[in-house]
């Protein structure tokens, strides 16, 4: 039943806009994205207020289970999940998705900054049991996104399909601006925001050495594959760091379909986009015009994406080609990074 619903929703999304997005303006003054701890206290407060603002606005996506604009983004990601992971357009689909979220914060909620990112590698420890990474500014209860969820014991093996060990929470977030009395989700059953910190995943999957390996890949196809690696936990992958390090077994961020329900999603994927952006800077003339990887998940011997492959994020924005999305200073996207 769920699969049928997903396929039906994907069909509807495909019809929303059949023509790639073409902006009439070029990027002349790109917002500069910064790491969370680079922001002042006022800038952090403004960003969080803008996220909360989205939850007060009426939805526009027309998708089931949406009560506000924040829900729109979660619903679009959820409906498209089967076709946007372990594919050649994974990184660029999510680049466009985060940029559209950033645009909504700025244009609909008056946010004056750029989308921040969370560089988890700065705090990853070689001591895999260390919890220091969860005691950093981004989890601050007053100026950050709050901390872990309440402890929930896992009694049904079906709730832990990957047999992950070391989970420390799983219930509703207990501190910060997204506790149940201040923030509720509505898509796919909704409820409170949940987190479930797993230190060994956060520390190992966020290691700078792993980022360096991803950024050492010689072409887009190998970069994209290294970014996601394989869909299990026998090998680390940086995409899984924030998702399963902070989302764990039972947390929102660890749910492949519903992960944008945690506002940290956009800072986590902002960092993955920064890593892509930095990789592109190594050979920008080439990497502004280079894509690869499968159209269908895991179909590495099948058809590959091309520069004119179209990305569709439903009613969140018009369609765009991968070539347009390779350029963060072009006719569709307009932002840059401060990596100091």
How should these model regions be labeled?
Residues 19-340:
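Intrinsically disordered, flexible peripheral segments
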Residues 1-23:
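Fungal secretory targeting signals
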């Amino acid at each position: 039943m769920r699969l049928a619903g997903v396929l039906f929703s994907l069909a509807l999304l495909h019809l929303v806009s059949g023509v790639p997005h073409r902006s009439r303006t070029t990027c002349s003054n790109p917002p500069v994205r910064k790491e969370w701890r680079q922001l002042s206290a006022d800038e952090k407060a403004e960003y969080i207020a803008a996220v909360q603002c989205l939850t007060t606005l009426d939805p526009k996506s027309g998708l089931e289970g949406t009560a506000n604009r924040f829900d729109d983004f979660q619903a679009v990601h959820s409906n498209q999940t089967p076709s946007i992971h372990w594919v050649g357009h994974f990184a660029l689909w999510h680049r466009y998705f985060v940029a559209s979220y950033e645009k909504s914060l700025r244009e609909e909620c008056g946010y004056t900054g750029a989308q921040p990112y969370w560089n988890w590698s700065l705090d990853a420890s070689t001591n895999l049991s260390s919890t220091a990474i969860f005691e950093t500014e981004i989890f601050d209860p007053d100026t950050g996104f709050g901390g872990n969820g309440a402890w929930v014991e896992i009694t049904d093996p079906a709730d832990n399909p990957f047999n992950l060990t070391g989970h420390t929470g799983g219930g509703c977030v207990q501190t910060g601006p997204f506790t149940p009395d201040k923030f509720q989700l509505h898509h796919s059953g909704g409820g409170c925001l949940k987190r479930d910190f797993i230190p060994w995943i956060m520390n190992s999957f966020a290691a700078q050495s792993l980022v360096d390996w991803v950024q050492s890949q010689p072409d887009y196809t190998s970069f994209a594959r290294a970014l996601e690696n394989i869909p299990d936990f026998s090998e680390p992958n940086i995409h899984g760091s924030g998702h399963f390090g902070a989302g764990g077994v039972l947390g929102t961020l660890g749910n492949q379909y519903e992960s944008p329900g945690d506002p940290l999603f956009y800072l986590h994927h902002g960092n993955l986009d920064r890593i892509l952006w930095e990789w592109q800077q190594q050979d920008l003339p080439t990497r502004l015009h280079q894509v690869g990887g499968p159209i269908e998940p895991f179909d590495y011997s099948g058809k590959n994406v091309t520069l004119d492959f179209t990305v569709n994020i439903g009613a969140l924005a018009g369609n765009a080609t991968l070539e347009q999305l390779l350029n963060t200073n072009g006719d569709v996207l307009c932002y840059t990074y401060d990596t100091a």
